[in-house]
Amino acid sequence: MLTSGVILLNGGLLSPNPGLIFWTTVSFVIVLLILRKLAWGPIISALEEREKGIQSSIDRAHKAKDEAEEILRKNRELLAKADAESDKIIREGKEYGEKLRAGIAEKAQAEAAKMISMAKEEIEQEKRRALDVLRNEVAELAVMGAEKIIKTSLDADMQKKIVDSMIQDLSTKRN
């Protein structure tokens, strides 16, 4: 029935109609079967592929995490070894420096002792030379004094004997 442009059906939109429910259910089951045949397989395989992809990504992430932890552990070990090696090198450098310093000090002491010894020897030689010169001068003075005293000139052999005798006398008196 048509009244003023509105179609009124028997019953309302919310009142149950068994025929409509039946055909709606049949249509739904048919669409469901068609979708199951045509779309369910691809949807499931797409979901399985997606699940495999996600699982693969998770596995790769775990593997990358494990590798990163291993690399971090190795880096820490290498850093510890490098620290130990640097400490060893520093310690060896200090020991070498100390040995070098001790060697230089020892060498300097030996050189100083050698220089002192050489200086003492040189002083002793100069002392001997000075004594020899002094003896010769004393001998000459003694000869000149003796010549003046006795007013005679002695020959060279006699003069040498007298000088040697005086030198021996002086040496024995000094020692």
UniProtKB/Swiss-Prot annotation:
Entry keyword set: ATP synthesis, Cell inner membrane, Cell membrane, CF(0), Hydrogen ion transport, Ion transport, Membrane, Transmembrane, Transmembrane helix, Transport
Compartments (UniProt record): Cell inner membrane
InterPro entries, alphabetized: ATP_synth_B-like_membr_sf, ATP_synth_b/b'su_bac/chlpt, ATP_synth_F0_bsu_bac, ATP_synthase_B_chain
Transmembrane segments: 14-34
Top-rank taxon, per record: Bacteria
Main location: membrane
Family: Belongs to the ATPase B chain family.
Function: F(1)F(0) ATP synthase produces ATP from ADP in the presence of a proton or sodium gradient. F-type ATPases consist of two structural domains, F(1) containing the extramembraneous catalytic core and F(0) containing the membrane proton channel, linked together by a central stalk and a peripheral stalk. During catalysis, ATP synthesis in the catalytic domain of F(1) is coupled via a rotary mechanism of the central stalk subunits to proton translocation. Component of the F(0) channel, it forms part of the peripheral stalk, linking F(1) to F(0).
Assembly description: F-type ATPases have 2 components, F(1) - the catalytic core - and F(0) - the membrane proton channel. F(1) has five subunits: alpha(3), beta(3), gamma(1), delta(1), epsilon(1). F(0) has four main subunits: a(1), b(2) and c(10-14). The alpha and beta chains form an alternating ring which encloses part of the gamma chain. F(1) is attached to F(0) by a central stalk formed by the gamma and epsilon chains, while a peripheral stalk is formed by the delta and b chains.
Protein name: ATP synthase subunit b
